From Swiss-Prot:
This is Cytochrome c551 peroxidase. Its main location: periplasm. Its cofactor is heme c. It is found in: Periplasm. It comes from Pseudomonas aeruginosa (strain ATCC 15692 / DSM 22644 / CIP 104116 / JCM 14847 / LMG 12228 / 1C / PRS 101 / PAO1). The gene is ccpA. PANTHER family: CYTOCHROME C PEROXIDASE-RELATED. Pfam families: CCP_MauG, Cytochrom_C. Residues 1-23 form the signal peptide. One of its GO terms (molecular function) is cytochrome-c peroxidase activity. It is an enzyme of class 1 (oxidoreductase). It catalyses: 2 Fe(II)-[cytochrome c] + H2O2 + 2 H(+) = 2 Fe(III)-[cytochrome c] + 2 H2O.
Length: 346
């Protein structure tokens, strides 16, 4: 008859304690680098956002009359039904022109340190003015926008309520502030990763935890950290090795166009990775459709590493855990134009 050996109590306890310690260490490491998405944003630059501003901004966000053609709205390129982006390489603008860069998601953009791939807008209010005036995008002017909105009594009343202290309520600046107020509501809390950061260890599965560890240990989190896992700082694309010209077109020098500083050539804002599984294609060029390919390219270009296939798969699984609760948006009824509203133009 075989005799059985009993595992010493200390060894038994240690065998249970080791995985728990490893789990705690992973959570502690992640908590030092990342923060969960807040449930809502109630103020901008220390000022409370009013309901009147949000509701006005929502209508303006969806109103194509802000464009010269009356065809394009903010939602055209930042579609709230498709992850806050438009899922094409570069957006189609006025007269079927194609923009030079992929449209970033509007979801959680309020948490970015600056807007656009090159950071040329300091906040969402400043960002809102850019596409409207860009001849490739909405091809309008501040004067035309003010004339359009001022010709619609319902908008005039809404601007007065949203900006009661303004000497000129219907203005291009206030339009941008209202859009910013609405866009600040477009946040996606309670992703599996958010729940994990808040203490729910079971919110991530085993593969996603492996991916999180690989993401941090490989160096991805050096650029992609904070609330948005990116969007906070600028880095050269091709820090170690330049990617193919299709991914990094030579004609787009990134932040150099803003600063005119040679060291900023091919420097871009680190892409926020929240909801990244929903916002293909990837990179400012919009030339990479598969998340696994984007991860492999970043390993080569930024880290100088040929990531192992298992690491790529695990990181992709982790990135899927960044998809949060999508905003439930009811399309607004827009006020009718009047006889004095400027007509669409080519």
């Amino acid at each position: 008859m075989q005799s059985s050996q009993l595992l010493p109590l200390g060894s038994l306890l240690l065998s249970f304690a080791t995985p728990l310690a490893q789990a705690d260490a992973l959570h502690d490491q992640a908590s030092a680098l990342f923060k969960p998405i807040p449930e809502q944003v109630t103020e901008l630059r220390g000022q409370p956002i009013s309901e009147q501003q949000r509701e006005l901004g929502k209508k303006l966000f969806f109103d194509p009359r802000l464009s010269r053609s009356h065809v394009l709205s903010c939602n055209t390129c930042h579609n709230v039904g498709t992850g806050g982006a438009d899922n094409v390489p570069t957006s189609v603008g006025h007269g079927w022109q194609k923009g030079p860069r992929n449209s970033p998601t509007v979801f959680n953009a309020v948490f970015n340190a600056a807007q656009f791939w090159d950071g040329r807008a300091k906040d969402l209010g400043e960002q809102a003015k850019g596409p409207i005036q860009n001849s490739v995008e909405m091809h309008s002017t501040p004067q035309l926008v003010e004339q359009t909105l001022g010709s619609i009594p319902e908008y005039v009343d809404a601007f007065r309520k949203a900006f009661p202290k303004a000497g000129k309520p219907v203005s291009f600046d206030n339009m941008a502030l209202a859009i910013e107020a609405y866009e600040a509501t477009l946040v996606t809390p309670d992703s599996p990763f958010d729940l994990y950061l808040k203490g729910d260890d079971k919110a991530l599965d085993a593969q996603q935890k492996k991916g999180l560890k690989a993401f941090m240990d490989s160096g991805c989190s050096a650029c992609h950290n904070g609330i948005n896992l990116g969007g906070q700082a600028y880095f050269p694309f091709g820090l170690v090795k330049k990617p193919d010209a299709s991914v990094l077109p030579s004609g787009d020098k990134g932040r150099f166009a803003v600063t005119k500083t040679q060291s900023d050539e091919y420097v871009f804002r680190a892409a926020p990775l929240r909801n990244v599984a929903l916002t293909a294609p990837y990179f400012h060029s919009g030339q990479v459709w598969e998340l696994k390919d984007a991860v492999a390219i970043m390993g080569n270009a930024q880290l100088g590493k040929q990531l192992a296939p298992d690491d790529v798969e695990n990181i992709v699984a982790f990135l899927h855990s960044l998809s949060g609760k999508q905003p439930r948006v009811e399309y607004p009824l827009l006020p009718a134009s009047t006889e004095t509203t400027p007509r669409p133009a080519e």
